[in-house]
Amino acid sequence: MPIVIEQSARGERAFDIYSRLLKERVIFLVGQVEDYMANLVIAQLLFLESENPDKDIHLYINSPGGLVTAGLAIYDTMQFIKPDVSTLCVGQAASMGALLLAGGAAGKRYCLPHSRIMIHQPLGGFQGQASDIDIHAREILAVRDRLNKILAHHTGQPIEKIQIDTDRDNFMGGDDAVSYGLIDKVLTHRTVTAA
């Protein structure tokens, strides 16, 4: 893990790179969305809210997706906390990663030029007694409907279009994701603020 040395009036302080970025209100969501990673992201969101509830949080996403329950825990926290959560796809935001990208604050959802975004219906499998398979089949259909409603809410697309478009893997580049309503803008360079 890279270490960053910061100079201050009190001397030097060493940070791992992610801790240093957290100090700037940047959270990285990288890799599979699973329970441990979700807990870390949620803890960082809550910590940054407690530090300053009025300042935006920046969530950088590079994820192939993962567990629906873990992803929805992150999503619910993003919606629950007071600060706006700006989302930025760097690399890919697929499946649950795409839902989290779309769940950023309106007007503050971005991707870089060569990012790849993919939406689809939830995946699942189960074996066991027929009655248990039936229970799990109904549950995955209910989860699919819940995820489609979230996407419809954040994209402005009709639920019927979301249902069709998520029936199979649906890949988009940045411009297509803007047109679809998953993000607000493709960023090609960082804006420079006047001194």
UniProtKB/Swiss-Prot annotation:
Q: Where in the cell is it found?
A: Cytoplasm
What GO biological process terms does the UniProt entry carry, in alphabetical order?
Answer: protein quality control for misfolded or incompletely synthesized proteins
The record's annotation in CDD domains points to: S14_ClpP_2
Which GO molecular function annotation, any one, does this entry have? ATP-dependent peptidase activity
What UniProt keywords apply to this chain's record, in alphabetical order? Cytoplasm, Hydrolase, Protease, Serine protease
Q: What is its EC number?
A: 3.4.21.92
Q: Name one GO cellular component term.
A: endopeptidase Clp complex
Q: What are the catalytic residues?
A: S95 (nucleophile), H120
Give the first-level EC class, as a single word.
hydrolase
Q: Which reaction does it catalyse?
A: Hydrolysis of proteins to small peptides in the presence of ATP and magnesium. alpha-casein is the usual test substrate. In the absence of ATP, only oligopeptides shorter than five residues are hydrolyzed (such as succinyl-Leu-Tyr-|-NHMec, and Leu-Tyr-Leu-|-Tyr-Trp, in which cleavage of the -Tyr-|-Leu- and -Tyr-|-Trp bonds also occurs)
Q: Cite the Pfam families for this sequence.
A: CLP_protease
Q: What does this protein do?
A: Cleaves peptides in various proteins in a process that requires ATP hydrolysis. Has a chymotrypsin-like activity. Plays a major role in the degradation of misfolded proteins.
How does this polypeptide assemble, per the annotation? Fourteen ClpP subunits assemble into 2 heptameric rings which stack back to back to give a disk-like structure with a central cavity, resembling the structure of eukaryotic proteasomes.
Instruction: Identify the HAMAP family for this entry.
Output: ClpP (MF_00444)
What name is this protein filed under?
Answer: ATP-dependent Clp protease proteolytic subunit 2
User: Which organism's genome codes for this protein?
Assistant: Methylococcus capsulatus (strain ATCC 33009 / NCIMB 11132 / Bath)
Record gene name: clpP2
